[in-house]
Curated annotation (Swiss-Prot):
The gene is ndhA. HAMAP family: NDH1_NuoH. It comes from the Eukaryota. NDH is composed of at least 16 different subunits, 5 of which are encoded in the nucleus. Coiled coil: none annotated. GO terms for molecular function: NADH dehydrogenase activity; oxidoreductase activity, acting on NAD(P)H, quinone or similar compound as acceptor; quinone binding. This is NAD(P)H-quinone oxidoreductase subunit 1, chloroplastic. NCBIfam families: PRK06076.1-2, PRK06076.1-5. Keywords: Chloroplast, Membrane, NAD, NADP, Plastid, Plastoquinone, Quinone, Thylakoid, Translocase, Transmembrane, Transmembrane helix. GO terms for biological process: aerobic respiration; photosynthesis, light reaction. NDH shuttles electrons from NAD(P)H:plastoquinone, via FMN and iron-sulfur (Fe-S) centers, to quinones in the photosynthetic chain and possibly in a chloroplast respiratory chain. The immediate electron acceptor for the enzyme in this species is believed to be plastoquinone. Couples the redox reaction to proton translocation, and thus conserves the redox energy in a proton gradient. InterPro entries: NADH_UbQ_OxRdtase_su1/FPO, NADH_UbQ_OxRdtase_su1_CS. It is a multi-pass membrane protein.
Amino acid sequence: MTSTIAIDQKLINFLMFLGLPKSLSEFIWICIPILVVVLGSTLGVLVIVWLERKISAAVQQRIGPEYAGPLGIIQALIDGLKLILKEDIIPSKGDNWLFTLGPAIVVIPIVLSYLVVPFGPNLIVADIGIGIFFWIAISSVAPMGLLIAGYGSNNKYSLLGGLRAAAQAISYEIPLALCVLAIILMSHSLSTIEIVEQQAKYGILGWNIWRQPIGFFVFLISSLAECERLPFDLPEAEEELVAGYQTEYCGIKFGLFYVASYINLLVSALFVSVLYLGGWDFSIPFLNDYLTSTDFFSQWELNETIVGIMTGIIGLGITLVKAYIFLFLAVLTRWTLPRIRMDQLLDLGWKFLLPVCLGNLLLTASFQITLL
């Protein structure tokens, strides 16, 4: 699906037409993507929390939230406001700097991951050409924040939770990266946009889920482990560690950990959509060609900008639908599988997933060599 949005220069020209200097107009344009990323990720968290509560209630044959707005849709917003208004307490014997720095180190890299998520050919904040490498690199920074938060709390449960989080992240970051490397070999590109375009050539049959089934399942498991979702929530196991690295946190700092967890889950779901499910592409060849042709929009006599916006909205909707399918599976997994032990977690990562990923990468590389 192609888009012709050139909104950056048009917005700058419009602001200059209003009398603003060019430097100020360019600065405003720089701030707009930042605002879009922050608001978009926050809205995504609110939707995920509401969906998880409703799906969890359905699994347990409950009603779920229903009083805060229609169907309880603003319950997550009210909970967020409650955390913001709570007092921020710092442990008397903890390290104030590390205790405060930990949540920031966790949240910032995860939010920056949105920069390279393509919702359409031109609906991406930063098409840097090495987007998938950027995501892998920056996502490895967040576990450092968890370890710092656990150490700065001066609490044995927090420290153990931070150590568990670091060990878990290292164990599953490698299989995740190897799955992505196999996709890169098949797509011949590090650009997230080019990976989607490569899958769009053959419609739904061109999705990488059919060409990389082993990598897809390993990617799903590794993503759940990276997001610390059940059955991989060992760093914050209530029965063992009270709340893990979050034990001493309250108020807005605790809310940052909460938000980071769901933002990370949404980012993982979006990359599942981009890497394996065709991203924004409609995936039905004849219908996709018709929707993206000029004949489809010419019947309403729309100008080029409106056409670009409409195709961009369609691509955004398709990407989110595919991503929320993964989110639905993640919520069902939470209420289906029991928590595993720490030794089982590490054995699964190092003794099973890593050899499987290496074998899958070897097969992919061998197949690509035969095509040369």
